């Protein structure tokens, strides 16, 4: 009985590790596909919205100083 329980626990742990590693590998693969895909190398700069008319030059200078 103890042996069966130990085998069950080991199987459960290995199955859990396989499930989690499969999800991680799938996310990595999707990231690579998105990076090198048809639209993957497009401009993903989301900071363009910062430079609208409502932000003053002093604000932009302050942001540049923070980013350095």
Swiss-Prot record:
Keyword Manganese: no
Tissues expressing the protein: Expressed by the venom gland.
Organism encoding this protein: Scorpio palmatus
Protein name stated in the entry: Peptide Smp13
Signal recorded as keyword: yes
Predominant location: secreted
Propeptide residues, chain positions: 37-68
Family: Belongs to the non-disulfide-bridged peptide (NDBP) superfamily. Short antimicrobial peptide (group 4) family.
Function: Peptide with unknown function. Does not show antimicrobial activity against the Gram-positive, and Gram-negative bacteria tested, as well as against the fungus C.albicans.
Cleavable signal peptide: 1-23
Keywords: Amidation, Antibiotic, Antimicrobial, Secreted, Signal
Residues carrying Phenylalanine amide: 36
Location of this chain's protein in the cell: Secreted
């Amino acid at each position: 009985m103890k042996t069966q329980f130990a085998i069950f626990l080991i199987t459960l742990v290995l199955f859990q590790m396989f499930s989690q590693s499969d999800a991680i590998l799938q996310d990595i693969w999707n990231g690579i596909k998105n990076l090198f895909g048809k639209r993957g190398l497009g401009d993903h700069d989301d900071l363009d919205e910062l430079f609208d008319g409502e932000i003053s030059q002093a604000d932009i200078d302050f942001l540049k100083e923070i980013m350095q």
